[in-house]
A protein has these predicted regions:
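Extracellular beta-strand ligand-recognition surfaces/modules
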Residues: 1-21, 198
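Active-site neighborhood of glycoside hydrolase catalytic domains
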Residues: 36-46, 232-294, 313-333, 337, ...
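Acidic-and-aromatic substrate-binding clefts and catalytic sites of carbohydrate-active enzymes
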Residues: 29, 55-70, 95, 125-132, ...
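Boundary/entry segment of secreted carbohydrate-active catalytic domains
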Residues: 31-89
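Aromatic-rich peripheral "rim/lid" segments of glycoside hydrolase catalytic domains that contact
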Residues: 96, 103, 182, 204, ...
């Protein structure tokens, strides 16, 4: 069976029409590969990286639909990876209901649901959190012996604009005092919910989620933010954002309350990291200026070879992050190439992976004991990638490995 999916920019509710569709076979096709016969990525790197992961979707849509509910995909993930990251279903936009599905509940009702309402929260209502996909994914992890990266708590994109307004009404921007309380409510509630769910499923909090992306892409905060967003409330604090530091502190305190601060790592995550490495290091140093609450740096690594970045620049960036002594993880790896050639992509991806492996094996363990603890490939195959030009290890599906695999 085949599913053809169309979408247009803008409102997901807009109607549109197709005049005609023509499907043309341009080649005679390739032999179908049984994915069960392929070598395992996680086994290949098991003595180098603790985690080898992919991103996936529990519900999803189009080519991404039901990835964690289909037997063939589940078996593929179990064989190839030991970690998953939800691509979108744990981002604030989804958890808060997006721009159109906001639901407010009373503080009393929220407390009955286990939400953490801080003393400085003075509003009568809070947003009801949609954690269905998160819970289902945790259940998937428990059933299939797979761990999870939690992505993400704070981002200037994919967070509904009404979250930053008075009374959640989508109009006037809220005050910093109001947002401080909302931030604390959201961060503490998210961590507590996940840890409670872990305990329910496995008997132990901290047993499934090993890393949280607390803040995503702050260095690129001016890049297409939701309007309004964090900067509209707090202003531009450059590389000393008080509210980002607070988010890490809230999250760290929740880990401390469960004795998990040494088992679960809080990450700062960003893209184009090889062009802003010094800023990222400065930001993380600020976050940790009072106490080491940020334990890791996430390198998204959305690459375009051979020049963005060059292998040498990528290696230099790894050196800078490893020198901080913090854990480093490659969190969203995909690699296009300017030529759009499969062999060129394979060569570039090979060089990137060889660089990551070399840096991990040859690091100064007295400076960075753990080093690079994980690599996550951002997607299962090209047709479900957010990027257009052959960025992943498989082409049309899990039975279609590319030379880069």
């Amino acid at each position: 069976d085949y599913l053809i999916y169309f979408e247009i920019p803008g409102s997901a509710k807009a109607d549109f029409y197709l005049d005609s569709v023509v499907i043309t076979q341009v080649s005679k096709g390739k032999d179908v590969i049984d994915p069960n016969t392929l070598a395992s990525i996680k086994d290949t790197y098991k003595n180098i990286f603790q985690y080898m992961g992919t991103c996936a979707n529990y519900y999803g849509y189009g080519a991404k639909k039901d990835q964690l509910r289909k037997d063939d995909t589940i078996n593929f993930i179990k064989k190839q990876f030991n970690s998953i990251t939800l691509e979108n279903e744990m981002k604030p936009d989804t958890v808060l209901g997006g721009f159109y599905n906001k639901k407010l509940i009373s503080v009393d009702e929220a407390k009955k649901l286990g939400y953490i309402i801080p003393d400085n929260y003075k509003e009568d209502e809070v947003p009801q959190l949609d954690l269905g996909a998160v819970d289902a994914t945790l259940e998937f992890c428990a059933e299939n012996n797979v761990k999870m990266r939690a992505h993400t708590l704070m981002w200037h994109q994919q967070t509904p604009s009404w979250f930053f307004t008075e009374d959640y009404n989508g109009k006037n921007v809220a005050t910093t005092e109001v947002m401080d309380a909302r931030l604390e409510f959201f961060v503490r509630t998210m961590l507590n919910h996940v840890m409670d769910k872990e305990k329910e499923l496995t008997g132990k909090a901290g047993s499934l989620v090993y890393a949280w992306d607390v803040t995503n892409e702050y260095v690129h905060r001016a890049n297409e933010p939701t309007s309004p967003s964090w900067m509209d409330v707090y202003g531009d604090m450059d590389l000393e954002p008080v509210y980002v530091k607070k988010a890490f502190t809230f999250a760290y305190e929740e880990l401390e309350n469960r004795g998990l601060q040494d088992q679960v790592t809080l990450f700062y995550n960003d893209y184009d990291e090889y062009n802003c490495a010094d800023k990222i290091v400065e930001l993380v140093n600020y976050i940790n200026s009072d106490k080491k609450v940020c334990g890791g740096i996430g390198m998204q690594s959305h690459l375009t070879g051979p020049e963005n970045p060059t292998i040498d620049l990528y290696a230099e960036t790894l050196d800078k992050f490893l020198a901080t002594g913090l854990e480093v993880q490659v969190t969203e790896l995909d690699a296009e190439v300017e030529s759009n050639d499969l062999e060129d992509q394979a060569a570039y991806m090979k060089s990137i992976m060889e660089t990551i492996v070399t840096k991990q094996l040859n690091r100064d363990k007295t400076v960075n004991p753990k080093g690079i603890t994980g690599v996550t490939i951002w997607g299962l195959y090209d047709t479900c990638s957010w990027r257009k030009n052959i960025p992943l290890l498989f082409a049309s599906g899990i039975n279609d490995p590319k030379p880069s695999f």
